[in-house]
Curated annotation (Swiss-Prot):
Listed name of the protein: Signal recognition particle receptor subunit alpha
PANTHER family membership: SIGNAL RECOGNITION PARTICLE RECEPTOR SUBUNIT ALPHA
GO molecular function: ATP hydrolysis activity; GTP binding; GTPase activity; RNA binding; signal recognition particle binding
Lineage: Eukaryota, Metazoa, Chordata, Craniata, Vertebrata
Pfam family of the protein (one): SRP54_N
Amino acid sequence: MLDFFTIFSKGGLVLWCFQGVSDSCTGPVNALIRSVLLQERGGNNSFTHEALTLKYKLDNQFELVFVVGFQKILTLTYVDKLIDDVHRLFRDKYRTEIQQQSALSLLNGTFDFQNDFLRLLREAEESSKIRAPTTMKKFEDSEKAKKPVRSMIETRGEKPKEKAKNSKKKGAKKEGSDGPLATSKPVPAEKSGLPVGPENGVELSKEELIRRKREEFIQKHGRGMEKSNKSTKSDAPKEKGKKAPRVWELGGCANKEVLDYSTPTTNGTPEAALSEDINLIRGTGSGGQLQDLDCSSSDDEGAAQNSTKPSATKGTLGGMFGMLKGLVGSKSLSREDMESVLDKMRDHLIAKNVAADIAVQLCESVANKLEGKVMGTFSTVTSTVKQALQESLVQILQPQRRVDMLRDIMDAQRRQRPYVVTFCGVNGVGKSTNLAKISFWLLENGFSVLIAACDTFRAGAVEQLRTHTRRLSALHPPEKHGGRTMVQLFEKGYGKDAAGIAMEAIAFARNQGFDVVLVDTAGRMQDNAPLMTALAKLITVNTPDLVLFVGEALVGNEAVDQLVKFNRALADHSMAQTPRLIDGIVLTKFDTIDDKVGAAISMTYITSKPIVFVGTGQTYCDLRSLNAKAVVAALMKA
């Protein structure tokens, strides 16, 4: 089974190409041109590229190159004959067009060689099946005939080799004892201390002697290692007659030092935060500058190098192969041509956690974009669709509006008012944790932060924010900022109106001169009407500068449902004429999904809003900005 067969001129014009199993022959052919033809390494007509074996034939008279590719694990004996037959027939059939040796004549020439090639391929395959009848192998040709006869004879009373090896240690203990022998079985000459040779009636081959010498050498050194191991074990003193008590896994612990809880503690005071490991809390990296998200790995780097090979080849061809860059247009794409490829792409996107409806819409958009487009000769339907899909995904992840919080905060400072950010989302996605990360990032950039605890529903929500505030205060104490308090928690306990607490927090921040107010809200499901009404009221009354939706990178179809219903609820329950909707997205738990990054596509596609932050860990420095190309590369990785 052939992957491809192509015929092109040394000027770079593809005259004819047959696509078999392989999706595209561009990469292997470019590698052949760069590594073999341009380097004048044509001594061998075979070349291996990744999983393919390429065989080629040069026609120096007409400046043609014939290349065939197939899987390197296959042994196709008819390939050489096929290349010769194709070369001969193609040259004779199109001699007139080829002899003109001009690019225009080759462009205008019609090389309808498909039927002839299939006929030659069928004849070559049939000829390879006609072989001489196989004969049965003789005993002299077998491996058993090459072994010495002595090695296949088992003497009565002789133990097999494996049992003899296992019983060597037991027999060594009995050696040197004064008692009578435990057995009277005859010992073969090869296992006794007697020399083995013709004088004892045993003849061994040269290979058998070498093998026995090797075994004796290994046994001598093995005994030395056993003695050294025994000596090291015996060095450790052991108490005789005493047995260490067994410690059960779930049996508790009776150690007094472990059970003693009477030591004084600070019970969560700020002094306890100062004694904690600051580096462990802070994490590694520069907190003031957001790094781009990196989704690559060692496999991705290798794939990236392979993907850059065709482009590098195009830059180095020059001269003789300078016209290789898509001068010939072969066919225009239709929906029937792209149907099977788009089905595979859709399944691939769904497997990478893209919502099913959005995957269908993306493939439909690509089909509309490519319908009627003319492909290049070396371009296949798969490569063309994949390239168009990649461009569409990058465009989706780069929306028109870009959220620059630092610039907006500086603008709010000039107006002498705090910059207000509200966090919303479903339960358990990490709103409070990522609020603390963003607080640390703002503190590293020199802005003071007031955290408003407006989650008055979940037990422990205020205590969680108090812990983050204490740790952030330890990282940025007032002493480092001229006595100015950089981070503070504003809370009114549980059961209060969240909108009223947010309003008081904003007024407090304005009076105390805080730069940013981060409002934490309670987690709520998108179908909970009372809680969604309370959220819409909070946003309408306080009019924050930025509304961030916090979502997990683990969700698939659920992401679409969450965002659609959140926006719908904010619009339905808002009392303003122009309701305030979600402005941006914070994508959390991105370090747990490997390359299944489809949630980023789903959330951005459904809202047309940017992903402002990406959470990648559990320390304050584990905050990244989205790199669209890295996400798309991870998404398209097979």
